Amino acid sequence: MKTFSAKPHEVKREWFVIDAQDKVLGRVAAEVASRLRGKHKPEYTPHVDTGDYIIVINADKLRVTGAKFEDKKYFRHSGFPGGIYERTFREMQEQFPGRALEQAVKGMLPKGPLGYAMIKKLKVYAGAEHAHAAQQPKVLELK
């Protein structure tokens, strides 16, 4: 018997919606990253994007454990000398709700063209409403 290798045109993708209200950031990100890669499917192939589409709602109500709400820092750099900027998790959630989750998931995905294609299948919304009702997403409950 030959080893099965998924073909990109044969992959069946589903849509899932996750409610992130009162869920821990890292636990949600780990599950989302795994589903975006397709590791939950028996036909998972590392070099093929076999993952599903994931919609995350209520990303503004994510929580972190310990003192990370004030202590966790996000850095970016303008490219100029001294051009480093930092934001705490609290500031990030106030100004750009959902970006902390996007960055956490992006860090868990492979780097390169395959990872860039996977992150495009993640849709994050701050509130309870999303624009993907036509895709009939299934509700995915996290522990």
UniProtKB/Swiss-Prot annotation:
Domain of life: Bacteria
Keywords: Ribonucleoprotein, Ribosomal protein
Any one GO cellular component localisation term in the record: cytosolic large ribosomal subunit
One function term, GO molecular function aspect: structural constituent of ribosome
An example Gene Ontology biological process: negative regulation of translation
Subunit structure: Part of the 50S ribosomal subunit.
Role summary: This protein is one of the early assembly proteins of the 50S ribosomal subunit, although it is not seen to bind rRNA by itself. It is important during the early stages of 50S assembly.
UniProt family annotation: Belongs to the universal ribosomal protein uL13 family.
Name this protein carries in UniProt: Large ribosomal subunit protein uL13
Gene source species: Neisseria meningitidis serogroup B (strain ATCC BAA-335 / MC58)
Taxonomic lineage: Bacteria, Pseudomonadati, Pseudomonadota, Betaproteobacteria, Neisseriales
